[in-house]
Amino acid sequence: IEIAYFDRGPIMEDELITGGYWSVYYYEGAIYGTEITRGLDILKLIPSEYLSENEIAAAALAYPMIGHRRAFNPQQQVPMDWPASPEVARAYIDQLLRDKAIDEDTADQIIEKLDQVKIEMEMGGNNRLARQINRFSSSVEGLNADVQTKSRLERLDATLKGISESLRK
């Protein structure tokens, strides 16, 4: 999926010198582009109307589903996964809000609980908070929504369940 357009312009104004990117990959919060003539470009994403700060934070948490979590070779095209974390849940909430698939009150209630997770995890967990977060689980059965919205709701649900499970003492 294209999320941005980037062009540095001609290498020389008056002479044809070919160049361009061999490859561009996202890894741990940065976009790495290997340009044929100029070398390596490293770009950071910034929030905009199309991409929230929460989505950027969640993207930085992605890890390979196969093998070591920090080993990454884009040529292997290993599928990526995300941990069940408040950052990931907030990213799904931002996407659902942007698409008007959930109401702001529900989003605020979930975020209020997510704000407590880190502290409670550092203290060894909290069964009560786990139950409260688990109550937000949603069913997409019979929901009149497109495939992408249903997928985001299912992933938010799975993420909230994972957070809830990690909070249990």
Describe these PLM feature segments.
Residues 57-169:
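Soluble extracellular-acting proteins and domains
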